[in-house]
Swiss-Prot record:
Cofactor(s) named in the record: Mg(2+)
Organism expressing this protein natively: Bartonella quintana (strain Toulouse) (Rochalimaea quintana)
Binding site for substrate: 95-97, 108, 112-114, 122
Database matches in CDD domains: trimeric_dUTPase
HAMAP family linked: dUTPase_bact
Lineage of source species: Bacteria, Pseudomonadati, Pseudomonadota, Alphaproteobacteria, Hyphomicrobiales
Main function: This enzyme is involved in nucleotide metabolism: it produces dUMP, the immediate precursor of thymidine nucleotides and it decreases the intracellular concentration of dUTP so that uracil cannot be incorporated into DNA.
Catalytic reaction(s) noted: dUTP + H2O = dUMP + diphosphate + H(+)
Pathway: Pyrimidine metabolism; dUMP biosynthesis; dUMP from dCTP (dUTP route): step 2/2
Annotated family: Belongs to the dUTPase family.
Protein name: Deoxyuridine 5'-triphosphate nucleotidohydrolase
GO annotation (BP), single: dUTP catabolic process
Length: 185
């Protein structure tokens, strides 16, 4: 039995024997394909019962180290392919400890993994700190939050169209003000 099969079997028992693509009111199962260079790494899991994000790990070769100099960015493989259910996305977010202690964060945050994407999840990291930062195999480099997606129907309206029976009011309490218009305190 592969690492992935064992994890899915354990996960299914913990999720009341849900099939890999099922959901109930409490759980959505995320089938994860583990690529060859990701074999042996821990699958994403929640660190605590209240965690929103699943930790993602660097799937570098055993002897490989990626050194990010200040200001440098790199695309780090995770060795994982997510098989998301339609109606969900995976948001890629930085880990707060890496950001605070080392200035390491994700670019394009939150990054969106669409439900129909079937390529490897890779993390675009940047070093905003003052010192070099080394990334090695198995290091927790980011987190992913699985979230529902609402797709909308887009319709064009005329600037003076105010028929509230067809479209929401365009008279917002802020008007067109933005970028700090509500204050700085």
């Amino acid at each position: 039995m592969s690492h992935l099969q064992a994890h899915m079997q354990r996960n299914n028992k913990e999720s009341h024997s849900l099939s890999p693509f099922s959901q109930d009111s409490q759980h959505v199962t995320l089938p994860v394909e583990c690529l060859e260079h990701g074999q042996g790494l821990e699958l994403p899991h929640y660190a605590t019962s209240g965690s929103a994000g699943l930790d993602l790990r660097a799937a570098l070769a055993e002897e490989e180290t990626v050194v990010l100099a200040p200001g440098q960015r790199a695309l780090i493989p995770t060795g994982l392919v997510f098989h998301l259910l339609p109606g969900f996305e995976a948001q890629i977010r930085p880990r707060s400890g890496l950001a605070l202690k080392h200035g390491i964060t994700c670019l394009n945050t939150p990054g969106t993994i669409d439900s129909d994407y079937r390529g490897e999840i890779k993390i675009l990291l940047i070093n905003l700190g003052q010192e070099n930062f080394s990334i090695q195999r198995g290091m927790r480099i980011a987190q992913t939050v699985i979230a529902p997606v609402v797709q909308v129907n887009v319709c064009a309206i005329e600037p003076d169209q105010k028929d509230s029976s067809q479209t929401p009011s365009n008279e917002g309490s802020r008007g067109a003000d933005g970028f700090g218009s509500t204050g700085h305190d």
